[in-house]
């Protein structure tokens, strides 16, 4: 009986180690968080959800594939519809949420906070005149300072599945 138990434990170990190593490379959703951002942020989401708020500034929403997701914005003082897929919002205390589908958000202002869950990229550029242009974190990791413009940082969150043929 003890020999069977030992064999079973060793067999489980042989199966678990490769599975754990493969788990680090699987495709899936990532998380990008921005806190107290001042400057310019451009988020290109391939899929997923994003929600946040901006104390003051301008938000340009691009929905490249109409109907594949929904974009909700509230609190804007001014709204300008540029085309079927592009809308510009400006003002104070703007809140926004994107659910599903592809999206592009261009946020320029102060007090930008958001969380993006899914797959995408973000270009982060802090306001050079700001005392503290904000911090960001990937996958609940350590918080990193947003670089001040003209320096920017391109960050990716999540892993897009590769196309199979």
Regions found by a protein language model. Name each.
Residues 1-6:
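Positively charged n-region of N-terminal signal peptides that target proteins for export
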Residues 8-9, 157:
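General helical structural elements
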Residues 26-31:
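N-terminal "mature head" segments of proteins
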Residues 32, 36-138:
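Predominantly extracellular/secreted and cell-surface proteins with exposed
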Residues 123-165:
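Edge beta-strand at a domain terminus
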């Amino acid at each position: 009986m003890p020999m069977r138990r030992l064999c079973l434990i060793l067999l489980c170990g042989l199966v678990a180690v490769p599975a754990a190593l493969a788990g680090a490379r699987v495709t899936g959703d990532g998380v990008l968080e921005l806190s107290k951002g001042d400057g310019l942020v451009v988020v290109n989401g391939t899929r997923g959800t994003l929600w946040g708020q901006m104390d003051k500034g301008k938000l340009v929403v691009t929905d490249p594939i109409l109907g594949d997701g929904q974009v909700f914005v509230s609190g804007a003082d001014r709204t300008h519809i540029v085309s079927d897929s592009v809308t510009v919002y400006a003002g104070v205390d703007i809140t926004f949420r994107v659910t599903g589908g592809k999206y592009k958000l261009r946020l320029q202002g102060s007090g930008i906070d958001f969380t993006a869950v899914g797959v995408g990229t973000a270009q982060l550029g802090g306001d050079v005149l700001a005392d503290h242009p904000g911090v960001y974190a990937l996958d609940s990791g350590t918080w990193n300072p947003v670089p001040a413009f003209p320096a920017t940082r391109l960050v990716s969150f999540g892993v897009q599945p590769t196309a199979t043929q």
